[in-house]
């Protein structure tokens, strides 16, 4: 045993230069297994640095080794542990999977430049007054006309009330004759009271008609903006989406569109009309009652507005905190529910609930601050308005005593101010919500201003390609996701039209990156990629992506029926074509066994289907797309061996006359490839056919092949050993049974 350990450690020391991070893990596992129990760390030691823990590990290994094997036999182990100390415990990644090395932004506009509020309003008004929609502009003009009529009727109402009070106050028989219906109607007081009612009804009528006419303008604007944002997000490059949480983006779009609706209503029907009505009331009071009334009114309104604006600005930060907490809570809930099975596997329901409750508590705290400060705002507004109204009433009373004003004038002044109080009470809410809506719209319009790094050249021609000309060529391609960490370092190869080429290599060697570059999710920093002899950067993205089909490693399906997900490969395909590709992918019979057949809902992200079924759906819809070039990114990774062989046979027929590139981990799936390209450290290390590469026993491919083959053989051997053990136990049981039977027979006494 000691000799075996010594040879193992000599081999490990000789392999220091080859993938250090892998061998460090191997050495650590070997040390722990040989030394009995591994090192135990206290809770404080777990938080220590990697180097500190490694030092503790090696010291523990020295002590344990000396105790168990003695100093002479542990020399090689000590040499190996010294080598371990010189290796970094955690190395920087040079590969890239998703957003490795960086967290997702929960704020959708994090790292983006804000858009000026004036530009937001200008952009929004361009949707309200579109040059290509004269019908919508006509609706806006009609709405403004009804708005003016409603405000005019509002001003008339207090005047009608004044004349009615003055008429009744004179108590003249000619002015008020209630002896019969005609005389009652004919009296001035009654006519004025009827006019009062008509004015109020007219104001309400104009307001409601205005809302009905303008409704189409507002909803059309919201729809167009939301559609443009949605389309723009789809046009952004993959790097943007990998750095943003989908839940946060969804909430940003939702809040932004709701904000547009509110701002449109607030600007057109609240803020501007309030200003207009304030000026109109002040002018009427100046003309009818004098400058003092106008000054008190303007002073009250000015103080009211200034107080509202100041307090609302201060309160806005609480709303921002609420939004952030709402975003975090929403993201946590979505993330947890999407990982429902993982939560169950680790019994972490309470942990997830506590985590979610933490975000809700933050939201609750900010919400309480917002509610309490709102009470302060409302009280301050009422106090200012009450002081102004009292001052106006005192002035009116003095005017009545002096004979300059009538009782009707006092009622008119009171009515005018109270009419202003309604929109003024709403002013605080309108201003607060408008500011919040502008914040939400800022996020929305900031997203619209984001420029994609992957775009067409001006007047880029479509890709000219046929299955006979679909050659793929990489020419000295250099690429890195993070500056200074090269993923591809001068990769060059060519895939002839109609040929099947496999790309293999270790994890992080750049296999999947080739798929992303060929689909133009990213651009290489150096070098060129050609398809059908045309540089990818010179042709339109739409034509390029129509010509390339991709079967991803992780197939994600839409929350819809199986038929919908299959049809997504070509939305114009007939049902017969959909059924044909399902049969080709070995999926048709499995679908027919489902309760609803092709109308079966697959669940969110396809969670109701098994991994193999999802993979077959992805393969089927890629076949339905019928592109000249197909990329398989470990497309059979989720399949069992029997299904894998069935699908591989089907795929051989599919790719027979088209260019195909297989990104493979299991080498057995690409044995029949016309050429196999082996990537190592971002470069093409080897290339050739399966048997040609195996002929070189020292090649990377040969080593990978034998490693995988030995693993399969070991699994088979373990299965055979278990079977033999089971058989030997059965034979032993039978032998024991025979001995018991024979002993009974030899005794001759049945009582035995």
From Swiss-Prot:
Residues 162-185, 281-290, 404-409 are mitochondrial intermembrane. It comes from the Eukaryota. Residues 1-22 form a transit peptide. It catalyses: (glutathione)4[2Fe(III)-2S] cluster(in) + ATP + H2O = (glutathione)4[2Fe(III)-2S] cluster(out) + ADP + phosphate + H(+). PANTHER family: ATP-BINDING CASSETTE SUB-FAMILY B, IRON-SULFUR CLUSTERS TRANSPORTER ABCB7, MITOCHONDRIAL. Changing residue 433 to K: Exhibits siderocytosis with increased zinc protoporphyrin. GO terms for molecular function: ABC-type iron-sulfur cluster transporter activity; ATP binding; ATP hydrolysis activity; protein homodimerization activity. Residues 472-706 form the ABC transporter domain. It comes from Mus musculus (Mouse). This is Iron-sulfur clusters transporter ABCB7, mitochondrial. Its main location: mitochondrion. Exports glutathione-coordinated iron-sulfur clusters such as [2Fe-2S]-(GS)4 cluster from the mitochondria to the cytosol in an ATP-dependent manner allowing the assembly of the cytosolic iron-sulfur (Fe/S) cluster-containing proteins and participates in iron homeostasis. Moreover, through a functional complex formed of ABCB7, FECH and ABCB10, also plays a role in the cellular iron homeostasis, mitochondrial function and heme biosynthesis. In cardiomyocytes, regulates cellular iron homeostasis and cellular reactive oxygen species (ROS) levels through its interaction with COX4I1. One of its GO terms (cellular component) is mitochondrial inner membrane.
């Amino acid at each position: 045993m000691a000799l075996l350990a010594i040879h193992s450690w000599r081999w490990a020391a000789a392999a220091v230069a080859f993938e250090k991070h892998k061998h460090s893990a191997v050495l650590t596992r070997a040390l722990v297994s040989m030394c009995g129990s591994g090192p135990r760390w206290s809770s404080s030691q777990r938080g220590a640095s990697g180097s500190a823990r490694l030092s503790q590990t090696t010291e523990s290994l020295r002590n344990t080794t000396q105790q168990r094997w003695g100093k002479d036999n542990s020399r090689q182990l000590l040499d190996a542990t010294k080598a371990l100390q010189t290796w970094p415990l955690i190395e920087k990644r040079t590969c890239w999977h998703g957003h490795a090395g960086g967290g997702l932004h929960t704020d959708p506009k994090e790292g983006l430049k804000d858009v000026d509020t004036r530009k937001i309003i200008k952009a929004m008004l361009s949707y309200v007054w579109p040059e290509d929609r004269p019908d919508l502009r006509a609706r806006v003009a009609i709405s403004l006309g009804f708005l003016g009529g409603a405000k005019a009727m509002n001003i008339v109402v207090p005047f009608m009330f004044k004349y009615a009070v003055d008429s009744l106050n004179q108590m003249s028989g000619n002015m008020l004759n209630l002896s019969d219906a005609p005389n009652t109607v004919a009296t001035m007081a009654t006519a004025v009271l009827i006019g009062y009612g008509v004015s109020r009804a007219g104001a309400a009528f104009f307001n409601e008609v205005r809302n009905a006419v303008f409704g189409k303008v507002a909803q059309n604007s919201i729809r167009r903006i939301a559609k443009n944002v949605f389309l723009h997000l789809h046009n952004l490059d993959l790097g943007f989406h990998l750095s943003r949480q989908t839940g946060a983006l969804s909430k940003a779009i939702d809040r932004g569109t709701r904000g547009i609706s509110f701002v449109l209503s607030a600007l057109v029907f609240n803020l501007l009309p309030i200003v207009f009505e304030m000026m109109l009331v002040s002018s009427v009071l100046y003309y009818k009652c004098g400058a003092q009334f106008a000054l008190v009114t303007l002073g009250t309104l000015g103080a009211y507005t200034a107080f509202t604006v100041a307090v609302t600005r201060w309160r806005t930060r609480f709303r921002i905190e609420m939004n952030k907490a709402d975003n975090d809570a929403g993201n946590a809930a979505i993330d947890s529910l999407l990982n429902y099975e993982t939560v169950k596997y680790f019994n972490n329901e309470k942990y997830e609930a506590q985590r979610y409750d933490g975000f809700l508590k933050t939201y609750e705290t900010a919400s309480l601050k917002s509610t309490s400060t709102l009470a302060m705002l409302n009280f301050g507004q009422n106090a200012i308005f009450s002081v102004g109204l009292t001052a106006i009433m005192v002035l009116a009373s003095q005017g009545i005593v002096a004979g300059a004003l009538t009782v009707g004038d006092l009622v008119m002044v009171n009515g005018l101010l109270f009419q202003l109080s309604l929109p003024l009470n709403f002013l605080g809410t309108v201003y607060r919500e408008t500011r919040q809506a502008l914040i939400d719209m800022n996020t929305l319009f900031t997203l619209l201003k984001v420029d994609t790094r992957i775009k067409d050249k001006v007047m880029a021609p479509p890709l000219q390609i046929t299955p006979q000309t679909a050659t793929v060529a990489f020419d000295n391609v250099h690429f890195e996701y993070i500056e200074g960490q090269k993923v591809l370092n001068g990769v060059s190869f060519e895939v002839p039209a109609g040929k099947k080429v496999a790309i293999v290599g270790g994890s992080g060697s750049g296999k999947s990156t080739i798929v992303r570059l060929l689909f133009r999710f990213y651009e290489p920093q150096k070098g060129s990629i050609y398809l059908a002899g045309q540089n990818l950067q010179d042709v339109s993205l739409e034509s390029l992506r129509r010509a390339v089909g991709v079967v991803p490693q992780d197939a994600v399906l839409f929350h819809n029926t199986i038929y919908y997900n299959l049809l997504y490969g070509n939305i114009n395909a007939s049902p017969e074509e959909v059924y044909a590709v399902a049969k080709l992918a070995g999926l048709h019979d499995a679908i027919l066994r489902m309760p609803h057949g092709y109308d079966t809902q697959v669940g969110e992200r396809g969670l109701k289907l098994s991994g193999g079924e999802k993979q077959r759906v992805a393969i089927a819809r890629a076949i339905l797309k019928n592109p000249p070039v197909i990329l398989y990114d470990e497309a059979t990774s989720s399949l069992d061996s029997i299904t894998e062989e069935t699908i591989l046979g089907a795929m051989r027929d599919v790719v027979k006359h088209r260019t195909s590139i297989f990104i493979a981990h299991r080498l057995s799936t690409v044995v029949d490839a016309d050429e196999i390209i082996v990537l190592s450290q971002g470069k093409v290390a080897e290339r050739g056919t399966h048997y040609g590469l195996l002929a070189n026993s020292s090649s990377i491919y040969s080593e990978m092949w034998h490693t995988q083959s030995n693993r399969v053989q070991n699994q088979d051997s373990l299965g055979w050993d278990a079977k033999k053990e089971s058989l030997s136990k059965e034979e032993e049981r039978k032998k024991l049974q025979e001995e018991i039977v024979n002993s009974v027979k030899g005794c001759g006494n049945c009582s035995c």
